[in-house]
Amino acid sequence: MKYNLTKKISYSIIILVLLVGLSLTAIFGMNGKGYGSAKDINLGLDLAGGVSITYEIKEDNPSSQDIEDTIYKLEKRIEGRSTESQVYKEGENRITVEIPGVTDANEILTELGTPGSLEFLDYTGYTAWSQGEDYTPLLTGSDVKTAQAYTDTSSKDSTPYGVSLTFTDEGGDKFAEATANNIGSRIYIVYDGSVVSYPTVNQAITGGNASITSMETFDAADNLATYIRIGSIPLTLNEVSSNIVGAQLGHDAIHTSLIAAAIGFALLCVFMIAIYRVPGVVATLSLIIYTTLVLFLVSVYDLTLTLPGIAGIILGIGMAVDANVIIYTRIREEIAAGKSVENSILAGYDKATSAIVDGNVTTLIAAIVLYIFGTGPVKGFATTLAVGNIVSIFTALVITKVIMKLLYNFGLTKPSMYGKTTHRRTYDILSIKKWTITVSIVLIVIGFITMGVQSALGNRALNFSLEFVGGSTTSFTFDKEYSQSEIENDIIPVIRDAAGITEVQQQKVQNSTKVSFKTTDLSLEQREAVEEAVTAKFPIEDGSIVETDTISSSVSSTMKKNAILSVILATIAMLIYIFARFRDIKFALAAVMALLQDVLVVITFYAVFRVPVGNTFIACMLTIVGYSINGTIIIFDRIREMLKSANSKTNITELVNSAITSTLTRNINTTITTLIMLVMLYILGVTSVKEFSLPLIVGIIVGFYSSVFLTSSFWYMLGGKNRGVIDEAVNKRKKAESIGKDGAQV
């Protein structure tokens, strides 16, 4: 780690340029056009608004299945534009689509208004079709298994873009027969009333594939492929209104959240420097790099940021801090053991790497599974979490190491500059396992009893929000335009008091005096009370009427199923990874048992305090799972390390207690740093942000409790207490020593 003066100066300049460059990029972006800047980040409907389009169903008395299928296919169509869009039923025959960050309603109308029907016609069918007569298509969109856009780089055509089609088995047979019967003739491919391709058949095509060629742009080909894959919309939709709407959570949500984040970040840095000194300074610099990199990537990859997405970033910051805490705790332990600072730094990074990689990879696996199988807010959360994970590993194991070496070689070599290790007596955590497990069981039982009582009283077991159960929408056209602040601070409290409810979402139509308020389902008396109370204080425009209607949940049954499936699969994937890394099913089972406890205890909190359960509920639960699994892996990693040095006289109970105690500082400090950010959001945030941050605060505390008091106890009870665990560890070490002494064995 010896550097000459030239290298010191060079590294200093590189790090300084990196910090300044990333900071300027995060603020101003690149190319002088704001590309990659934080200001260029797409914000969701909850934070920035977007376009709202309402369609009327043309068919009379459509079935609920057709409506649900239509909503699902609209969701899939707009998913490529934004994972944070909402589609829901309004009244009996209307469907509303809301897409964040869009200012051109006509563009969306064109995209979504496409029915999506695909037909293959021979010349006879084409002639009848073009004259408006009855015809029988050779194939339809239902015969297509999948469709993908492509670019033919070998083509000399000015339009080398197309869509490759793969037929179903039945569709392939139909296409083979159709081409065999039309050699020398054309087959017309008709999509939504327009001929998109009419190739001449040279021979029978039996491979089950076909292509639509000569598309004008790749985007056009990609959109067509998407619509073909999804299939046609079963109902005919007529657009009745389209508006640009403001943020659902209001302007203050962003402003106050940014202030809270800035204060929280500053306090976090002060805490790290106070506790870890020189490494704390390194952590502060790495967190600045981490934050700017994450914001840059979110902006560059055009991700839409909503409250669930912010949850993913908060978890990412927590994991970035956690990685630093793990390393610096290890460094202090090595210094306390008598090693030089230089060797302690090297050993600290070496010993911390496996725990950091395991914790982040486990969470990254979960994020990938959630992204693949999740929809809507789950996918948005998974995206920001994955980005944060990758950046966290990079900054912790690469950036901080470079900065740490640099500071050491600049003369910061005194052991006191790297913090002081507090020698704790070993706490006998396992001796109180019956009490800690009993506390968890009692809390979980309280939750189930509360939900049962609520159901018996005619209420829902949990206080499901509009996203899950729908409700009512009430629209007022006022005699003047009110600001977002006036709507939030003056009008919404009147609605809450008149209806006796807590959850009210608002949408302000831009350049209009019309404001819509979404609430839980209101009775006739509640609607009349709201109308009377609001119009008494805030007069409406002459000749206008107060519009009221029912709305369905924006989280469809399919999205709910996908969310549950994705969480289950993510948990299984984490279990498999933990088993593969630790080679012990007891570790995996203990981790999953602790995660289940975390989720159920937080659900108890939701049930007892009637906190609204909406889109952020899913993100909250996933954040807690990610945080808890990280803490669990740290302790398990320490148990595994101690088992490697165990001997025949080692007491397994003392070993486990020692592992828990030695990682206690890390668990406490990581919990404090994560809570700093969340508590500031709760103190300064608007109501919706408070409802989002409070369960996270509870979940982080519950995660700390389970990591310290439950996971190792579960492992111990599942068989870790058996003498065979020590014997197996001793035999493995002896075998490894034998191999090292005698050379390779055949």
Q: What residue spans do the PLM features occupy?
A:
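A structural signal for conserved, well-ordered secondary-structure elements
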Residues: M1-V746
